[in-house]
Amino acid sequence: MLSISMNMTLAFTTALLGMLMFRSHLMSSLLCLEGMMLSMFILSTLLILNMQYTITFMMPILLLVFAACEAAIGLALLVTVSNTYGLDYIQNLNLLQC
């Protein structure tokens, strides 16, 4: 169980480093964000099953709901930006130009 927790922690930190390093494209940022959410889901599920917290069994499901909402909003933003500008650079997301 310890090796699975360490692997998921390593996956989270790798996705976080990817988010910090490859932040020029929106698609790569969304993929790193999904990797972070997936590792958080697996870690929370393992923690709940290992510690047998019966009160918090709904926490991983709520995390999946928020991840699905984040993915839908991110994909809608990606489609809008790529249709408007033709590129998926994050520099195009300047809110002052509205």
Swiss-Prot record:
Name the Gene3D superfamilies for this protein: 1.10.287.3510
> What's its membrane topology?
Multi-pass membrane protein
GO BP terms: namely: ATP synthesis coupled electron transport
Q: What is its EC number?
A: 7.1.1.2
Q: Name the predominant localization.
A: mitochondrion
For this UniProt record, the keywords arranged alphabetically read as follows:
Electron transport, Membrane, Mitochondrion, Mitochondrion inner membrane, NAD, Respiratory chain, Translocase, Transmembrane, Transmembrane helix, Transport, Ubiquinone
Q: What class of enzyme is it?
A: translocase
Q: What are the TM regions of this chain, as residue ranges?
A: 29-49, 61-81
What InterPro entries does UniProt report for this protein, alphabetically?
NADH_UbQ_OxRdtase_chain4L/K (IPR001133), NUOK/Mnh_C1-like (IPR039428)
Q: Output the Pfam families linked to this UniProt entry.
A: Oxidored_q2
Q: Which domain of life is it from?
A: Eukaryota
Q: Which GO terms describe its cellular component?
A: mitochondrial inner membrane; respiratory chain complex I
**Annotated Gene Ontology MF terms?**
NADH dehydrogenase (ubiquinone) activity
> What family is this protein classified in?
Belongs to the complex I subunit 4L family.
Q: State how it assembles.
A: Core subunit of respiratory chain NADH dehydrogenase (Complex I) which is composed of 45 different subunits.
The protein's name is NADH-ubiquinone oxidoreductase chain 4L
**Which organism was this protein described from?**
Cheirogaleus medius
Question: Upper lineage ranks?
Answer: Eukaryota, Metazoa, Chordata, Craniata, Vertebrata
As recorded in Swiss-Prot or TrEMBL, the protein's gene is named MT-ND4L
